[in-house]
Amino acid sequence: MAAYRSRRGDSMRSLNVKCCGMEGREAGMVQIEAGCARLSDRPAFCGSASLASSEYYLFPGFVDVHVHLREPGFSYKETIMSGTRAAARGGCSAVCPMPNLAPVPDSLANLKVQTDIIRSDAVVDVYPYGAITKGERGAELADLAELAPHVVAFSDDGRGVQSREQMRQAMEQAKALDKLIVAHCEDESLLNGGCIHDGAYAAAHGLPGICSASEWKQIERDLELAAETGCGYHVCHVSCKESVTLLRDAKKSGVDVTWETAPHYLLLDDSQLMDDGRFRMNPPIRAKADREALLEAAADGTLDMIATDHAPHSAEEKSRGLRGSLNGIVGLEVAFSALYTGLVRSGVISLERLIELMALNPRRRFRIPLREGDFTVFDLDNPYTIDPASFLSKGRSTPFAGWQVYGKCLLTAVDGGVAWQDADFAG
């Protein structure tokens, strides 16, 4: 499918870089003029490695396969313009927005409402999902064949598909259409009104907990169905150690499965929670052992990609503490910085592995092309403090507020057009 995007760009200057590809280092230049950016004086851009100078690093543009842009239907939380500007500021040249919208993109007519706004307002490439079920209500499958040429994959993100037979039918159709099923795995019968992980913090503070089985039980079911149907299957926002074990074993057995986790599950556990809405999301931040399992998967190659699950809400909706706030935090503008600081600088994974997780693997799995004009430039040497008041997103709720991090995005180019330039970098 083709990406949807408007055409925007700002003037910039030239930047000398030293390119680090698979076959060594060579001099090069990023030329930015009249809203266009391109790499020159070097061979074709190699997306399998970072490009570096003594001052700046140039990477292939990131792809976030799990974002909530909220428009149409909930533009008081986020708009396609504000969300894609936030994406560009975080180094993304493409995003895949989830279908929990109003109207839900469960038909071509409803999808067109979304894509018309994307064509008008988006500053990065946008690859929308189509819904698995009509209205994401779980009662009847959407017309997947009608939607397939126009969407990147199918998902009912925001809730799990509760019926085993319905998920089987969805996988059979998606397999025939050569499309992925992208699953929010959550058994609603096991939620028990919980608001955070069913662990030490919940017990100490008298809060209802969400058990890990609510996630891994549905992953277990779906992996069986994926093996039976041969459907390509991708699991969203994995948070617990049991899920990691299931996914590792399924890969070894030949199931066509990939999975993502989010920065907050890699960098936080429930010992760090506060009674603040910026720590509430679904699935919840879990225990130290779960985080350790995710870190091991990131290091040993089991983890396929990192996606933010960027889910903005209004300030009022996030002001009610852990028990009363809505699920969801923002992450597009700070994901790379938090991960580079917490995982690369600490030696958990290499910089190349982080780029694989954020840029290369998402493109491969979701068939999103990497053009020479899709790149992002970062300063990795100078720290800055995460300040939600500076966000381009309408959302301000992040557990990383106040963190000192390394990795500031200076420029993002999308198909040669400048989608983001840092004020300190413009000249």
Descriptions of predicted regions:
Residues 1-47:
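N-terminal metal-binding scaffold of metallo-dependent hydrolase/deaminase domains
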Residues 11, 141-306:
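Histidine/acidic residue-rich metal-binding segments in metalloenzymes
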Residues 17, 35, 55, 66, ...:
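Divalent metal-coordination and catalytic microenvironments
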Residues 44-58:
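Active-site metal-binding motif and surrounding structural segment of the metallo-beta-lactamase
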Residues 56-121:
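Metal-associated gating/positioning segment near the N- to mid-region
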Residues 65-78, 101, 127-139, 158, ...:
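Active-site mouth loops of central-metabolism enzymes
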Residues 204-232, 299-300, 304-306, 311-378:
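His/Asp/Glu-enriched, well-ordered alpha-helical/loop segment
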Residues 321, 372-427:
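C-terminal cap of metal-dependent C-N hydrolases
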